[in-house]
Amino acid sequence: MSIRDTLKGGKGEVIKDPRVFIDPLTVFKDIPFREDILKEVAVAVRYFVKSDVKFSTLFLGLTGTGKTFVARYMLNEIEEVKQEDSDYSKVKQAYVNCREVGGTPQAVLSALTERLTTDEVPKHGINLGEYIEKIKEELNGKKALVYLDEVDTLIKRRGGDIVLYQLLRADADISVIMISNDINIRDYMEPRVLSSLGPTVFFKPYDAEQLKHILSIYAEYGLYRGTYDDNILSYIAAISAKEHGDARKAVNLLFRAAQLASGEGFIRKDHVDRAIIEYEQERLIEAIKALPFHYKLALMATMDAEDVVTAHKIYSDLCNQYKQKPLSYRRFSDIISELDMFGIIKVKIINKGRAGGIRKYIEITDKDKIRKALEDTMNLGFEEQW
């Protein structure tokens, strides 16, 4: 297929509407296998709007189990109901992905205040309480429903608990839905925050049959008829079910496989296999970008070291360069072990005998990709990482 034919589309095209994969809320009129959760949240929202009963809840589940999708769906439904029920006209909503805005208490509250008020909000120079006061002034009799996605990145930061506590205990009609894939997130919360927190909603992983059903909806609306078959959907669903039932992965694999099949008219197994390889590479990059600051420094140090001892020396030099206090060799070694566990690097332990002792050697297969991912993130404001 020539470049011109590809640009024009038509012959052998597989994807009918790419928007289905990019913004599925335009297609889904309900969310399969999450109806009970949606109803539970809808009841809480109704009591909040109509009976002044504030609530807070935590959406907890592994990646790709529908937490963000349910939150986004509920946000959209509430906006639609505003046209039908005047009680909802005074409800303001704000969705913030804590990781994407930086994760610090200052960054999260700044983003939240911007979304709930009409004023331009400074990201520095005012204390956390002032953000809350700005929100309260803006509401002035109205209600606010706040969605904090990837809230674990906030909770694990110094002062992150203060943000939640102030929101949950604010003298204003604010209800909060928090979203996290860290099943141990409650361990990072202070007792006063836990006592203010409402029930936790657990999102169970999808099984292969459920994933196949979800994929069939995406395929029906997003792909041309006859460009895929039942076996392809089953294959993708089975692969994704093995990894804690990740619907996001399943949908991404189907979309990428369809892109690879463009011009050929049909999605084959080898298209899916290629999509899997690309997906794993992209996930590696995202994992690196999400690492804490000193983990990134440790990883950067391994790029030019063959063993852990040498890497620690390079790491210490990097800490001096970035005006950070180096972690001890023992803690650094623990971080290297964690990076090994994450699959980012590989550590090989070799016993050199009585004279040489035990040495930990470092092996890295994707140095270029890791370097690029580090370069993209190492220009962040490190003073905010601690």
From Swiss-Prot:
SUPFAM superfamilies documented for this protein: P-loop containing nucleoside triphosphate hydrolases (SSF52540), Winged helix' DNA-binding domain (SSF46785)
InterPro entries, per database record: AAA+_ATPase, AAA_22, Cdc6_C, Cdc6_lid, ORC1/CDC6, Orc1/Cdc6_arc, P-loop_NTPase, WH-like_DNA-bd_sf
Cystine pairings recorded for this chain: none
GO MF entry, a single one: ATP hydrolysis activity
SMART domains: AAA, Cdc6_C
Keyword entries, A-Z: ATP-binding, DNA replication, Nucleotide-binding
Record-level GO BP terms: DNA replication
Residues that hold ATP according to the record: T65, G66, K67, T68, F69, Y206
Keyword Nucleotide-binding: yes
A Pfam family that the UniProt record links to this protein: Cdc6_lid
Record carries keyword Cell inner membrane: no
Similarity section: Belongs to the CDC6/cdc18 family.
Function: Involved in regulation of DNA replication.
Name of this chain's protein: ORC1-type DNA replication protein 3
Organism annotation: Sulfurisphaera tokodaii (strain DSM 16993 / JCM 10545 / NBRC 100140 / 7) (Sulfolobus tokodaii)
